[in-house]
């Protein structure tokens, strides 16, 4: 990767990351105000939304070939990277353990991982539908 492309990638990721982080703050604040602090609804919501959108964008942008490269930097690496948060997920698990709510750790992780996988696949299926490509998630039975 040459220097110009590297700097362009960095700027696109930073721009998308700024918007994604801001969006995470807004969603988290709204859900905290609505549902309170008993469960990390904001982190769960942004991680599931991010999973769905990432699945969709991965398929949709892949169909654009090299033309989708800059959009991938901006939207997937930047926006979705800024929106979703693994560190908050882990920190909230630690808070559950320290507040004698250890059972919530398992529930929270299971919900996040299982629904995250479901949402990324649903997003990919929607991307395949929009791109009219039914081969996206098919299993190659010849291998």
UniProtKB/Swiss-Prot annotation:
Na(+) binds at residues 81, 84. PANTHER family: FLUORIDE EXPORT PROTEIN 1-RELATED. Signal peptide: none annotated. InterPro entries: FluC. Fluoride-specific ion channel. Important for reducing fluoride concentration in the cell, thus reducing its toxicity. This is Fluoride-specific ion channel FluC. It comes from the Bacteria. Its main location: membrane. It comes from Xylella fastidiosa (strain 9a5c). It catalyses: fluoride(in) = fluoride(out). GO terms for molecular function: fluoride channel activity; metal ion binding. Belongs to the fluoride channel Fluc/FEX (TC 1.A.43) family. The gene is fluC. The chain crosses the membrane at residues 3-23, 41-61, 76-96, 103-123. GO terms for biological process: cellular detoxification of fluoride. It is a multi-pass membrane protein. It is found in: Cell inner membrane. One of its GO terms (cellular component) is plasma membrane. Keywords: Cell inner membrane, Cell membrane, Ion channel, Ion transport, Membrane, Metal-binding, Sodium, Transmembrane, Transmembrane helix, Transport. Pfam families: CRCB. Na(+) is not transported, but it plays an essential structural role and its presence is essential for fluoride channel function.
